[in-house]
Amino acid sequence: MAEHKPWDGRFAEKTDDMVEAFTSSIQVDKRLYAHDITGSIAHARTLAEAGVITSDEADAMEKGLRQVKGEIEAGNFKYDDSLEDIHMHIESRLTEILGPTAAKLHTGRSRNDQIALDNRLYLRDETRRIIAMLHELRQAIVDSAQAHLDYFVPGYTHLQRAQPVLLSHHLMAYYEMFTRDSDRFTDALYRINVMPLGSAALAGTTFPLDREYTASLLGFEGVTQNSMDAVSDRDFIMEFLSDASICMVHLSRMSEELVLWSSSEFAFLNMPDAFATGSSIMPQKKNPDVPELVRGKTGRVVGSLMAILTTMKSLPMAYNRDMQEDKPPLFDAVDTLKACVAMFARMVPKLEFNRRNMFDASNQGFLNATDMADYLVEKGVPFREAHGIVGRAVAYALDRGRELHEISLNDLRKFSDKLEKDLYEALTVEHVVERRRTIGGTASVNVIAAIGRAQTQLQAETSGD
């Protein structure tokens, strides 16, 4: 246990052991060690540049900090609840290595702007990793869409069969979702990548520290403009968690469809053995546990967003100890999102779609009814009138247990004399799909173009254009 704390000068009694355990955050924030050390090295360089310490002292600090980093990564570092957090642990060990020189490192700095910096460095790194992981998932989806261009599948509304679409069109809908997710994370980086160090406790520092210089050392785009806001701002965490929640909702929606499609009732998809599990009692079972878990883990990430919003909602400026509670939900959400995106990127290329079952389902249930109405419109029948005609024809077919295209022309003409033999071609699955050529529609020419645009976009992201 540490004999003295860096702030205990005005205290007559030592901290209660239970209070030390209660307020300690080291088991959570120790993952920030590398970012904390990176920030401290930059701060030492800034102190030297301002003439507050010598260059030799800054060199010694950097060498000592790198030694601490090595000890942590080698598993030789000892943690102690009495030191509260990762900042104090690193400073305490640096003091053991350097002696009095280490005491100069915290000049012009508070733990308030120090943790604000660590959070931003950490989240900048993790956001970039997530963007890269989403790139892999999006590429996997595009590749699967390319491989299944001639597969048809029912499109659904209200979980009822609606109109047939290309499976590739369905998959590319998820590409659009995950691209928006990637764009949101990219946009969030602009607000994450701002340097708060130099704000000190809340009012700035009396030392002539060049904050722009520190920002350049750490690769930040700029510096914060208000010291009170800088140490109390957690908007960037809330924004990240909002983006993460939306991304997880997209993963959850896709998971739900994979679960449904792999069921015997749908049988559109065979979940690969490597991504399924069995039952401890029912030998025949093959359970889609991976998408089920992703669906379940969505609640954790959304819960993390609610946790930080609730923590921050009533805090006066500037820093409050409540903000220590920002890290558990943030870290958990980052870990969860990364695991789920990585799992999907690995699983999507292995999905086995049942072409015949999907086509048969697309050819049943009157998915071509809208096209029969459109056919009548092209013959001069007003759409609402055509809608009623087809509705009555559907009821007639239902009573006889048949599809529209299975009803004879003579029987269909009882509903409208505008119906001709060419109607049957208009009612085929292929024709229904290929007629939808408006921008964004499911016609193969559109889907092929969408895949091409996506490949170009992904390639540009890889090359950095």
From Swiss-Prot:
Catalytic activity, EC: 4.3.2.1
Subcellular location: Cytoplasm
Keyword 4Fe-4S found: no
Reaction catalysed by this enzyme: 2-(N(omega)-L-arginino)succinate = fumarate + L-arginine
SUPFAM superfamilies: L-aspartase-like
GO terms, biological process: arginine biosynthetic process via ornithine; L-arginine biosynthetic process
Keyword list, A-Z: Amino-acid biosynthesis, Arginine biosynthesis, Cytoplasm, Lyase
Main location, first listed in the record: cytoplasm
GO CC terms: cytosol
Pathway info: Amino-acid biosynthesis; L-arginine biosynthesis; L-arginine from L-ornithine and carbamoyl phosphate: step 3/3
Chain ranges passing through the membrane: none
PANTHER family recorded: ARGININOSUCCINATE LYASE
Family as reported in the entry's similarity comment: Belongs to the lyase 1 family. Argininosuccinate lyase subfamily.
Protein name in UniProt: Argininosuccinate lyase
Gene transcribed to yield this protein: argH
